[in-house]
């Protein structure tokens, strides 16, 4: 039996690949740049600081060398070691999913920029977990005696990427 729905009555699918002139490889190269910057700064800190050492930079910011065996805010840091491989696997799964998203949504520049930042940050921290068994953190912001948990360039990239994803979605919703 023939369908009674006409072709023009179906909702138009957005062609996510047609707009823009970027490729997934460009976005992955940007993610690789994030990984390289993250690892560069971590290597500099590891070579010039001893564990736990803190050097003031401003009245609210120190450079430090600390290790995080857990996730954000040291979540599960004392879990006994299994978390290293759990978070490594999670980072790899998230990375693979993001690569798939980059192929699927290449023309959405802000979206791809955001997930490329997240990809670079995730891979940067996965490298630490595989090579060192923990993530190297070195940025310490504080107010008086309250210190925000130390973090690194990869964490910054993940956070900025997440904020940009929210901005991208809000812009997309506002258009409709």
From Swiss-Prot:
GO cellular component: plasma membrane
Pfam family, one: Peptidase_A8
Active site: 137, 155
A GO biological process held by the record: proteolysis
Molecular functions (GO terms): aspartic-type endopeptidase activity
Signal sequence residues: none
Catalytic activity entry: Release of signal peptides from bacterial membrane prolipoproteins. Hydrolyzes -Xaa-Yaa-Zaa-|-(S,diacylglyceryl)Cys-, in which Xaa is hydrophobic (preferably Leu), and Yaa (Ala or Ser) and Zaa (Gly or Ala) have small, neutral side chains
Keyword annotations: Aspartyl protease, Cell inner membrane, Cell membrane, Hydrolase, Membrane, Protease, Transmembrane, Transmembrane helix
UniProt pathway: Protein modification; lipoprotein biosynthesis (signal peptide cleavage)
Chief location category: membrane
Cellular localization per UniProt: Cell inner membrane
PANTHER family the record matches: LIPOPROTEIN SIGNAL PEPTIDASE (PTHR33695:SF1)
Family (UniProt): Belongs to the peptidase A8 family.
Protein name per Swiss-Prot or TrEMBL: Lipoprotein signal peptidase
Organism: Cupriavidus pinatubonensis (strain JMP 134 / LMG 1197) (Cupriavidus necator (strain JMP 134))
Gene: lspA
């Amino acid at each position: 039996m023939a369908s009674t729905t006409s072709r023009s009555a179906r909702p138009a699918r957005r062609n996510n690949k047609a707009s823009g002139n970027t490729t997934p490889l460009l976005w992955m190269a940007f993610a690789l740049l994030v990984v390289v910057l993250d690892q560069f700064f971590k290597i500099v800190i590891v070579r010039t600081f001893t564990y736990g050492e803190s050097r003031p930079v401003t009245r609210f910011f120190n450079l430090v060398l600390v290790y995080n065996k857990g996730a954000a805010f040291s979540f599960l840091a004392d879990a006994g070691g299994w978390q290293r491989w759990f978070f490594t696997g999670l980072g790899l799964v998230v990375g693979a999913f993001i690569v798939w998203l980059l192929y699927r949504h290449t023309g959405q520049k802000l979206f791809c920029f955001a997930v490329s930042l997240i990809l670079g940050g995730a891979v940067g921290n996965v490298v630490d977990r595989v090579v060192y068994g923990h993530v190297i953190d070195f940025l310490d912001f504080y107010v008086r005696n309250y210190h925000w948990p130390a973090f690194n360039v990869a964490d910054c990239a993940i956070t900025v990427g997440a904020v940009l994803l929210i901005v991208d979605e809000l812009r997309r919703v506002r258009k409709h």
